[in-house]
């Protein structure tokens, strides 16, 4: 009886053990340890201009969530977000500019295990891009490197609030070329401008024979634009200038340079306007004639340029007599086009004035005279034409702007635009017949 009991008990235990082995689930496999994510953006020492930064990375096989680390020193140890589903995370950074941030992502599997991924760290810098403060009514005067500073008294610098040193030239690769033998150096003109409370801008034009090929070639590639902007910023900073004037004559829709001009101006503006540090101006065509040249100035650059020097002159003819190259009517036509037709902000439209005269119906070679030279030959400061002799031509009529017309144009610009520009300072009369004096007196600018 005892033997039967023992046998029965053993059978039951064996059966229970057998059932237990069949009913127990197999152990779960260990989750795969995920690799590191590739940082997508922001990356590579890039700049961001918003305090709301979208951090983006690649998905990783075996990762169920991601922890995001960010800080202001390398290999940050503080996670700004944990268990993030997906591959983006928006983070708000402080509004203090010029701070560099370091960041990386740690993918985690379902068990919460991860690989150290700090080696994938990338950086970005928060910057502020804003235009510097407007100067109000602009009175811009160009000063060519081939003129003598001794011939232009301090008062002429006080009459202007912007002086443009003209010109450095650009070559096809984007390098800047300073004047080889300047009568007046950039440093000397900058010193005189600053001592008379004027901003000093570096004027840049094209070093090629046609005045546009080097700009066109440089701007056609990202490397060319980058090199150009780097060189521009080096000169602006080293010479302690207040900005840059771009004098590309002219980009055009006919060859696609309008597209690369737009890219160049936007990229240059971003560099100059960082921390609202420097001004950017552009010389633009008068706008009287329809076509690819005036259409090349796209409206999308209006917000990124501080002011436009509208070249409302040189509308001459070598075959038709009695034609003024820059009368009052041309000024109204130009401003109407840029302000009304094109919607250029009025405060940024600067009306160009000529400090020289041109003949009509004959060659322009050696017959163009400065305003001061016209007066020295008996021209009247209150009129717009005179009989002069020059370049082998005797007693021909030259057309210029006297004080009366300059006053009218200055008032027009005061009423509907943002200021005036004179090409160029040396050509003006040094005394009471000065065109700049007439303009300043008209608009109430003290000097």
Where are these regions (language model features)?
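Glycan-binding loop/region signatures in secreted carbohydrate-active enzymes
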Residues: 210, 346-416, 437-447
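Glycan-recognition patch characteristic of GH18 chitinases/ENGases
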Residues: 127-236, 323-328
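Conserved aromatic anchor
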Residues: 53-62
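Bacterial Sec-dependent N-terminal signal peptides
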Residues: 3, 13-45, 125-135
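Substrate-binding surface in catalytic domains of secreted glycosidases
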Residues: 140, 172-184, 230, 250-379
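Beta-strand-rich modules
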Residues: 94-114
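Short beta-strand segments within Ig-like beta-sandwich modules, predominantly Fibronectin type-III
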Residues: 80-86
């Amino acid at each position: 009886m005892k033997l039967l009991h023992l046998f029965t008990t053993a059978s039951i235990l064996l059966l229970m053990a057998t059932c237990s082995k069949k009913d127990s689930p197999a152990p779960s496999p260990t989750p795969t340890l995920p690799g590191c994510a590739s940082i997508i953006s922001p990356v590579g020492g890039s700049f961001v201009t918003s305090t709301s930064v979208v951090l983006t990375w690649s998905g990783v096989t075996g990762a169920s969530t991601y922890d995001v680390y960010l800080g202001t020193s390398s290999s940050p140890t503080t996670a700004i977000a944990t268990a993030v589903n997906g591959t983006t995370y928006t983070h708000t950074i402080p509004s203090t500019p010029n701070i560099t941030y370091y960041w990386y992502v740690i993918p985690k599997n379902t068990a919460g295990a991860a690989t150290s991924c700090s080696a994938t760290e990338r950086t970005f810098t928060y910057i502020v891009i804003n235009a510097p403060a407007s100067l109000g009514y602009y009175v811009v005067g160009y000063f060519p490197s081939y003129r003598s500073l001794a011939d232009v008294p301090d008062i002429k610098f006080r009459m202007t609030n912007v002086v443009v040193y003209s010109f450095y030239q650009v070559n096809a690769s984007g390098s800047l070329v300073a004047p080889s033998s300047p009568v007046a150096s950039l440093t000397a003109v900058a010193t005189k401008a600053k001592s008379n409370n004027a901003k000093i801008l570096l004027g840049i034009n094209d070093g090629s024979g046609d005045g546009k090929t080097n700009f066109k070639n440089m701007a056609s590639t990202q490397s060319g634009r980058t090199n150009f902007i780097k060189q521009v910023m080096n000169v602006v900073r080293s010479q302690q200038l207040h900005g840059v004037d771009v004098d590309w004559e002219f980009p055009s829709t006919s060859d696609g340079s309008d597209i690369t001009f737009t890219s160049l101006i936007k990229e240059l503006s971003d560099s100059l306007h960082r921390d609202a540090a420097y001004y950017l101006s552009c010389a633009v065509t008068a706008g009287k004639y329809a076509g690819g040249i005036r259409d090349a100035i796209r409206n999308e650059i209006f917000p990124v340029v501080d002011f436009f020097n509208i070249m409302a002159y040189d509308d001459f003819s070598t075959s038709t007599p009695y034609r003024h190259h820059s009368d009052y009517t041309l000024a109204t036509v130009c401003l109407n086009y840029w302000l009304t037709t094109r919607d250029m902000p009025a405060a940024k439209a600067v009306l160009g004035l000529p400090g020289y005269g041109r003949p009509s119906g004959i060659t322009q070679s050696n017959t163009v005279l400065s305003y001061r030279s016209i007066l020295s030959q008996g021209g009247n400061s209150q009129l717009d034409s005179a009989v002069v002799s020059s370049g082998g031509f005797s007693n021909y009529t030259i057309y210029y702007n006297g004080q009366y017309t300059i006053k009218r144009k200055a008032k027009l610009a005061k009423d509907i635009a943002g200021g005036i520009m004179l090409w160029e300072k040396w050509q003006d009369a040094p005394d009471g017949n000065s065109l700049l004096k007439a303009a300043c007196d008209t608009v109430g600018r003290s000097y």
